[in-house]
Amino acid sequence: MRHNKKFNHLGRTNTHRDAMLSNMACSLIKHKRIFTTTAKAKALRKYVEPLITKSKEDTTHSRRVVFSNLQDKFAVTELFKEIAQKIGDRPGGYTRIIKTGNRLGDNAAMCFIELVDYNENMLKDTAAKKAPKTRRSRKKATASVAEAPTAEAASEEKAAE
């Protein structure tokens, strides 16, 4: 039976895959965005998101656990100091995959994988979208309330005549 065998091996041995994901995670933490194939990005997302969750709690144990996966002092300090503070209130979903099309040589699906809170363009768009948003139902309710007194006043004038 194939229970619990759903895992993309990426055509590599276990040690090669672990080393590749570790290097890609360090690059993602340092540069905040990397360009890679979609399959590698999806594997990297499953690898790096638990590490980012661990970095929210800055203890010696969590630093050692993360360092055992990354093996890069600069990436670990960047993760625990800068990134953990910026995503402290986010409950998950720290990465975003943006598909960019296929590679010319072998037609492999390519994409960007980036940390969500570090894309300035999307942060500006969400801030701009949130400001002018109003609710229609309240405007209709106030408009109907404003019309009601005028109708009552008109009926009172007719009764007075």
From Swiss-Prot:
InterPro entries: Ribosomal_bL17, Ribosomal_bL17_CS, Ribosomal_bL17_sf. Residues 142-153 have a biased composition (Low complexity). It comes from the Bacteria. One of its GO terms (molecular function) is structural constituent of ribosome. Residues 130-141 have a biased composition (Basic residues). SUPFAM superfamilies: Prokaryotic ribosomal protein L17. The keyword Ribosomal protein applies. One of its GO terms (cellular component) is cytosolic large ribosomal subunit. Part of the 50S ribosomal subunit. Contacts protein L32. This is Large ribosomal subunit protein bL17.
